[in-house]
């Protein structure tokens, strides 16, 4: 499967400049982690400026129970455990198409979904012995969300994600689509590496998994959703 080659995210950035000692200090922003995500990436020129907190909100620090404890949680969400979070700044909205376009225009950056697939790099992410697909299957592509006509099992993502050649942030639904008139929509078809490149340019960083879950819970305790629980 080619699905593992891409990590799709909505870019929601965390500020790295602080005006309070209680706000979490980030020594280095957007430094690629080693190991699982280690790879060579295109270097972009980093802007030198103070992070403008306009459009951001301060998330007060606190303690919360991270992870799942119900039958709908994924295996890697267990066990539920207490986590202490320092205060941090976070964008109110996801990064928009217009903001990402500015980044691309100023740096010449090319996203993962727009690049030809490097089989030698890809096969390292696949089970040993995986046969090389036909070259036509190694063309630039991305996963596109396809609504289902009825309720489906949540254990097979292929029922609502379709691998589509030519799909990228400029063409969200594939060839023939565009972001015209959607400049203020969240940018999509962005890999982890694309996100890292963007936040390095912007002088911010991605939230940690704990920060993201803490903020997403909306201040509620042990609620299933940010707006509460549903039957």
Task: Specify the residue positions occupied by each region the protein language model found.
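Sec-dependent signal peptide recognition
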Residues: 2-8
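A short alpha-helix/helix-coil micro-patch that ends at or immediately precedes a cysteine
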Residues: 95, 99-110, 191-203
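C-terminal motif of bacterial Sec signal peptides marking the signal peptidase cleavage site
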Residues: 13-15
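Extracytoplasmic
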Residues: 51-54, 61, 78-80, 85-87, ...
